[in-house]
A protein has these predicted regions:
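N-terminal acidic leader/helix
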Residues: 1-26
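Non-catalytic, well-ordered alpha-helical scaffold segments
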Residues: 5-9, 24, 33, 38, ...
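Amphipathic, hydrophobic secondary-structure cores in small proteins
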Residues: 16-18, 24-47
Length: 70
């Protein structure tokens, strides 16, 4: 479980940098949408093989889409 949590933290921080927001704000917004558990943790096996830059783009885009109701 440690690896999944470490991966999620790295993805959250990298996504926050992409969006120009704090890690806390990114965490709060992802948490509100259920994306930490349902995207980063549950899809760890699939996502951790990608580059951190790719994961940051993916989680940022997913967050914006979910917030927009897409």
């Amino acid at each position: 479980m440690y690896r999944r949590i470490h991966f999620a933290v790295m993805a959250i921080e990298s996504g926050a940098r992409k969006l120009g927001i704090s890690g806390k704000e990114m965490h709060d917004r992802l948490s509100k949408q259920g994306l930490i558990q349902n995207r980063l943790i549950k899809r760890y096996e699939e996502l951790h093989t990608q580059s951190l830059d790719w994961v940051a783009d993916d989680i940022s885009e997913t967050l914006l889409n979910w917030e927009a109701g897409l």
